[in-house]
Amino acid sequence: MQCVLAIDAGGSKCDALVVTLAGDAVGWGRCSVKELGSGRGPGGSGRSATTVRRAMLQALEQVGGAQILEVAGYGVGSEQVRGHFGPAVRFRGVREHDAALALVGAEAGIVALAGTGAFVYGRGPDGADLHLDALGPLLGDYGSGYHIGLMAIRAAARASWHPRHATSLAEPVVQACSAFRPNRARFSLVEYMLGNPDRAEIASLAELVDAHAEAGDAVARQILITAADELAETLWDVVDRLSLANEHLPLVGTGGVLTGSRRYWEHFCDRCKEIAPGLEPVQAPGPLVAGVAFLALKGLGIADSQVYDRLLQSVLKASPQMCGRALG
């Protein structure tokens, strides 16, 4: 059985997917920051060698003696691939926004990603393109899971200052952060933040914020609105510089935050209508790793609409965890 291996190595997790040349998903794996034994790294825990290797092995264990013709992905280097497979297996670097556009069958359009990090990418019908943000948590990642998590930590820190700052997030945020330091006899939120925690840990708090926003907490709701507004500002910059405000193009929303938070997505779409009324917002119909796999098959000259449909259907059926809406 000849296959391709697709890898989506993000800030908090790594997805790996084995697909046959006919488009059938036959093996998949995921390793996230929340799992014991996952790796850590300054470029994002999902891109660490340990995390990538664990996700790949999970996927490969399900396909036995399959022949891997090519490995395609982003957030992972060719040296990591060759270290596992040797020089005989080809490596195809894929850009994250291309995988998102592939999922909706578009060559031109806008991709807005809000996961652990954040960016907006645009490509017009004339081929002119622009990629903004993805600068990391210190310089950018506006509207990202990290951005949301940091606002949640700050809200928890000042929740007791005055009744107007009260939020149901306070105790759950402290508990979530302390869980990342299980061997500490006494946990201090100040010490935790001064210890430069992994950005994936901070981004994981976005899930808490969304849950408390849905439960009615005003502070949590405002955090989501603020984050969505920030991503919309990046969208405005891209659309304006490329003169795409009135173009009828897809706006593909992807990343755990954009696809996992109803409130965030709805507010972002409302802002999109104000900024670029011609754009058509749509959430990515499947995990980005499926887009990576499709691009790998396309690069081999064997991808068409039937292969795409088969790939997406088999991914959605075979990997419910991968297609889940975990934020961050």
Give short role names for the model-derived ranges:
Residues 1-66, 104, 108-110, 154-328:
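ATP-binding/phosphotransfer module of carbohydrate and carboxylate kinases, centering on a glycine-rich
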